[in-house]
Amino acid sequence: IDVQIIPFLDLKQTDLSPFEGFVISGAPILLTEIDPEPYINAFRWILNENRPILGICFGHQILGLLHGARVARMKEDRDFQEIEVIKDDLLFERLPDVFEMQEDHCEHISVPKNFDLLACSDACINEAMKHKDKLHYGVQFHPEVSGNYGNILLENFTALVMSQQKK
């Protein structure tokens, strides 16, 4: 699978049509301390997007804000946290019902009305969510730095992207 990194500042002038799926990464931005509108506007294309999307941390929050979620401050969480799956989904295939993932945030979002809550933790109610009609996922934790379980989750998302190519 080919992967291309597109810096945020290059997003507006990048043709996204060749891509099969998207990962929107974390960012050192506190949405409660800035005007989030420029970021929401930069990602507004997601609202009409049917290809798979995985939002991680900041990406999770942006995905939620686009769909009406609210962002709020919380106790800082910068360690591994036990994540509990509360709704089965292909994103969690081959993972136990409770697994550890690395956290690095001090904000959280509510669950938008057109999303299902998939996972929670003691620190954060909305650890993972999925759009009810699309393969649009958000995870508050950081699978990319969470070892084997994180790798499995990213492999699962990649498999979801590849399954859509065949349709």
Spell out what each predicted region is.
Residues D2-L54:
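Flexible gly/pro-rich beta->alpha loop and the following alpha-helix that scaffold active-site loops
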Residues A27-P28, H60, P143:
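Active-site metal-binding loops of divalent metal-dependent hydrolases
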